[in-house]
């Protein structure tokens, strides 16, 4: 099982960031691994008690990959997910709040909040990502990060440029909504694969994207598609405030 749904038939995927390299250790302190015996999804810490991820990971909940919500372990402060390094905090999830407009067919509003069963301890290894002050513009270089579902076991990072709405639409005609942004290289070779789903795309130090979908890995003219976080600020803030 992968934290992945593509709106068209998925091509075979490698489940890792393609063309990336190992992040400097603990350089992405907001990075979360959602763990159920293996890293099945990424996420982003927003506060002591809340994590942002992709709504489509709930397909795992109903498909039986995860027998109940409390089975999801939220892993913070990780770098090598196979080795205890002394910086980790493992906290069970308490509840999932999927965006009410999420559409599993189109993947529109592919965004979800996860409340932790207890607050995380914030330190230099575990620190929330800032939400965006405004939407990011085309050409901005952003960083995506994740482990994928199988390999590698050390956190991978990759810098990708935000594409224009036109380039995004042309890559995926009639599949892009106003709540999606594309990033990556139209020539292929570098991309986030779906094992990294739900994880962060950081632009100028702010969380602008949630890894959502894309067709295969690093294919020519097929950039990665991300949920546009700046469209959801009021929902995120209201939901976190109401607990």
Q: Across the structure, where does each feature detected by a protein language model lie?
A:
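Conserved H-D interstitial segment of serine endopeptidase catalytic domains
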Residues: 11, 51-54, 58-104, 158, ...
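Active-site substrate-binding loop(s) of clan PA
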Residues: 61-63, 85, 97-103, 119-152, ...
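Conserved hydrophobic/aromatic beta-strand scaffold that supports enzyme active sites
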Residues: 31, 50-52, 88, 111-113, ...
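Cytosolic, low-complexity regulatory segments enriched in Ser/Pro/Gly with interspersed Lys/Arg
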Residues: 1-11
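A short, Trp-centered hydrophobic/proline-enriched beta-strand micro-motif
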Residues: 24-36, 75
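Extracellular trypsin-like serine protease catalytic domains
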Residues: 9-17, 31-35, 140-243
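Extracellular/periplasmic catalytic domains that process cell-envelope and extracellular macromolecules
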Residues: 23-27, 45, 66-68, 104-107, ...
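A conserved glycine-rich beta-strand in the N-terminal activation segment of trypsin-fold
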Residues: 31-48, 106-107
């Amino acid at each position: 099982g992968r934290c992945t749904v593509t709106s068209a038939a998925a091509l075979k995927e490698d489940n890792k960031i393609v063309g990336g390299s190992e992040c400097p250790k603990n350089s992405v302190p907001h990075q979360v691994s959602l763990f159920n015996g293996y890293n099945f999804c990424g996420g982003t810490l927003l506060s002591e008690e809340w994590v942002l991820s992709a709504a489509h990971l709930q397909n795992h909940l109903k498909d039986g990959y995860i027998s109940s919500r409390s089975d999801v372990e939220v892993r913070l402060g990780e770098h090598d997910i196979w080795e205890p390094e002394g910086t980790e905090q493992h906290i069970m999830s308490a509840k999932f709040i999927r965006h009410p407009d999420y559409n599993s067919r189109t993947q529109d509003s592919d965004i979800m909040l996860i409340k932790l069963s207890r607050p995380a301890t914030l330190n230099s290894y575990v620190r929330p990502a800032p939400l965006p002050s405004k939407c990011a513009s085309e050409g901005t270089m952003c960083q995506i990060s994740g482990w994928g579902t199988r390999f590698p076991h050390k956190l991978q990072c990759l810098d990708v440029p935000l594409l224009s709405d036109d380039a995004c639409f042309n890559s995926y005609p009639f599949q892009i909504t106003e709540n999606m942004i594309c990033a990556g290289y139209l020539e292929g070779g570098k991309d986030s694969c779906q094992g990294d789903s739900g994880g962060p795309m950081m632009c100028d130090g702010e969380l602008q994207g949630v890894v959502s979908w894309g067709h295969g890995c690093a294919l020519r003219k097929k950039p990665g598609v991300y949920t546009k976080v700046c469209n959801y600020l009021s929902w995120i803030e209201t939901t976190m405030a109401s607990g």
